[in-house]
Curated annotation (Swiss-Prot):
Recorded coiled-coil stretches: none
InterPro entries documented for this protein: RAI1 (IPR013961), RAI1-like_fam (IPR039039)
Catalysis performed (reactions): a 5'-end NAD(+)-phospho-ribonucleoside in mRNA + H2O = a 5'-end phospho-ribonucleoside in mRNA + NAD(+) + H(+); a 5'-end (N(7)-methyl 5'-triphosphoguanosine)-ribonucleoside-ribonucleotide in mRNA + H2O = a (N(7)-methyl 5'-triphosphoguanosine)-nucleoside + a 5'-end phospho-ribonucleoside in mRNA + H(+)
Organism (species): Kluyveromyces lactis (strain ATCC 8585 / CBS 2359 / DSM 70799 / NBRC 1267 / NRRL Y-1140 / WM37) (Yeast)
Any one GO molecular-function label of the UniProt entry: mRNA 5'-diphosphatase activity
Residues binding substrate: E260, K275, Q297
Pfam families for this protein: RAI1
Function text: Decapping enzyme for NAD-capped RNAs: specifically hydrolyzes the nicotinamide adenine dinucleotide (NAD) cap from a subset of RNAs by removing the entire NAD moiety from the 5'-end of an NAD-capped RNA. The NAD-cap is present at the 5'-end of some RNAs and snoRNAs. In contrast to the canonical 5'-end N7 methylguanosine (m7G) cap, the NAD cap promotes mRNA decay. Also acts as a non-canonical decapping enzyme that removes the entire cap structure of m7G capped or incompletely capped RNAs and mediates their subsequent degradation. Has decapping and 5'-3' exonuclease activities.
Protein name, per record: Decapping and exoribonuclease protein 1
Enzyme Commission number: 3.6.1.-, 3.1.13.-
Gene: DXO1
Cofactor binding annotation: Divalent metal cation.
GO terms (BP aspect): NAD-cap decapping; nuclear mRNA surveillance; nucleic acid metabolic process
Cofactor: a divalent metal cation
Length: 403
C-alpha cells in the first residue's frame, strides 16, 4: 500500500461545457516571477480552473494514452529485480474476486472468512519497510533506461514515483508545504525525487503518534487478509510489485511513473488498490481529502480500481468490503449535494485538481528548463507552500542522472 487553503470567491464559468484548454496556462501579468540567478519565486495562487461548484457526470482522466510499459518485482532481502514476470503479481484471493464481480456484499462465504477480523492483530510484531526503500530510485532509473528510446524527444517527460505526483496534485487541498528535488537531464527530461532535508516520518513510520501508526497498520493487515498467501518459490514476504506507466499530460509533457501495486484481480486483469477506512462522512474534511487522494492515485493508472475494507472505528474489526471504480469515487466527492455547500480547499473538486495538475506541470517544465544547464544534469529544490507559491532554487543534495 502506497503511503502521504483557500476559501475565496470563485468566478463562475460562463458555460459548463467550456473547453478546459482555455483555462490551462495563466497569462496574467500580475503573476510575474521574482527571479535571482538560478532561482525563481512565482505565485500560483490564481491558477486557472473551473468553478469549485463545477459538476460533470463523467470523471476526467488525468493522463491520456496511458499504458503499462513494464512491471517489476523487487525482492528486498537480496535486492533482486525481476522484470516483466506476470506470474509474480500479488493476486487477490479467488473468493474476493468473485465477491467483487457479483457485487453480493452479503455473500456468506466472504462474511464468514473476513468480516469481524481485528485489523490491529499483529501490530506489535510488525516491522515496516525502511523509508529509503519506498523512495528508492533504483527501479525507476532502470525502467527509464529500458524505455528511454521510445520516449518522444519533442516532449519533456517527468520521471517519478507515483506518490510524488500525487503530492504535487494535492497541494491546493492541503494546509502543509511540499518540498521535492527535480533534476533536469541533458535530454530535457526531469526526474522527481524525495527532498531528504524535508522528508518527515509519517503514517506507519511516524514515531510520536502510536495511534496513527496502528491505524495505518490496518491497511497492511487488510492486504495480508485479502491477497493469496505466499507459496514457496513464488511471492516472498518482503517482495514489492511495481507497475511502470507512461502517459501524456498534454502536447508538451509526458509522465513515466513507478507505482507500487497492492494486488491484481485475476478475473478482470485489473490492479486493485486495497484501502482500510472507517465509514466515510462526506462532511468531514479529512474524509473528503482522503477520497480525492484515492481518486488521483487510481486515475494515474490505465486499469485500476479500489477495494475498501470499512472497519469499526472503536474495535477496528472489519465490518464491510466494498469495491469502487474510479467513477464511483469521483461521484462521491463531485455531486451537486456536496459542492453546493460552503467549503475550503476548493471543495476538494477533482476537476479543479485536474486543472491544477495541468497548470503546475506546465509551469514547472517551462521554468526548470529555463534555469537548467544545457550540457549537464541540474538538480533544483522545488517547494510549494500553503499559498501555492512556487520556489525553485539550486539544490545542495546531489541526485545521480537517469542515464
Amino acid at each position: 500500500m502506497t503511503t502521504v487553503s483557500c476559501d475565496k470567491d470563485e468566478n463562475k464559468v460562463d458555460q459548463l461545457g467550456e473547453s478546459l484548454s482555455q483555462l490551462r496556462i495563466s497569462t496574467r501579468k500580475n503573476n510575474k516571477p521574482s527571479q535571482k540567478k538560478g532561482s525563481l519565486v512565482l505565485s500560483c495562487k490564481k491558477f486557472p480552473h473551473v468553478s469549485v461548484n463545477y459538476v460533470v457526470d463523467k470523471t476526467p482522466k488525468l493522463l491520456t494514452d496511458c499504458k503499462e510499459v513494464h512491471n517489476c518485482s523487487y525482492i528486498i532481502n537480496d535486492a533482486t529485480l525481476l522484470w516483466n514476470e506476470a506470474s509474480r503479481k500479488p493476486r487477490l484471493r479467488p473468493e474476493v474476486c468473485t465477491y467483487i464481480k457479483d457485487s453480493k456484499w452479503e455473500n456468506k462465504a466472504v462474511k464468514d472468512s473476513f468480516i469481524g477480523i481485528d485489523l490491529t492483530k499483529g501490530y506489535d510484531d510488525y516491522v515496516p519497510l525502511d523509508r529509503n526503500v519506498l523512495n528508492s530510485l533504483v527501479i525507476l532509473k532502470e525502467a527509464y533506461q529500458r524505455y528511454e528510446k521510445t520516449l518522444n524527444p519533442e516532449k519533456t517527460t517527468f520521471v517519478s514515483l507515483r506518490h510524488h505526483i500525487i503530492d504535487i496534485i494535492m497541494c491546493p487541498f492541503l494546509d502543509e508545504p511540499l518540498s521535492l528535488l527535480m533534476t533536469v537531464q541533458p535530454d530535457k527530461n526531469i526526474l522527481i525525487s524525495v527532498d531528504k532535508s524535508k522528508d518527515k516520518p509519517n503514517g506507519i513510520h511516524e514515531t510520536r503518534n502510536s495511534f496513527n501508526k496502528k491505524i495505518c497498520y490496518t491497511g497492511f493487515a487488510l492486504e495480508d487478509l485479502l491477497i493469496e498467501s505466499p507459496t514457496e518459490g513464488h511471492i516472498l514476504e518482503h517482495e514489492l510489485y511495481y507497475s511502470i506507466v507512461h502517459g501524456s499530460l498534454n502536447d508538451e509533457i509526458d509522465l513515466l511513473i513507478q507505482a507500487e501495486m497492492d494486488s491484481i484481480n485475476t478475473l478482470t486483469d485489473t490492479y486493485t488498490e486495497i484501502k482500510s477506512s472507517v465509514h466515510f462522512k462526506l462532511g468531514n474534511t479529512y474524509h473528503r481529502r482522503k477520497l480525492l487522494r484515492m481518486w488521483i492515485q487510481t486515475n494515474l493508472l490505465p486499469k485500476s480500481d479500489l477495494l475498501i475494507g470499512f472497519r469499526n472505528s472503536y474495535s477496528n474489526e472489519l465490518e464491510q468490503l466494498k469495491a469502487y471504480k474510479i467513477q464511483d469515487i469521483y461521484h462521491k466527492i463531485n455531486n451537486s449535494s456536496i459542492v453546493g455547500k460552503p467549503g475550503k480547499f476548493y471543495k476538494f473538486n477533482p476537476n479543479v485538481a485536474n486543472d491544477w495538475f495541468q497548470h503546475i506541470f506546465q509551469v514547472l517544465k517551462q521554468n526548470l528548463l529555463l534555469l537548467s544547464q544545457e550540457s549537464t544534469s541540474t538538480t533544483f529544490k522545488v517547494q510549494i507552500d500553503t499559498n501555492l507559491t512556487l520556489s525553485i532554487s539550486p539544490a545542495s543534495q546531489f541526485v545521480t542522472a537517469l542515464g
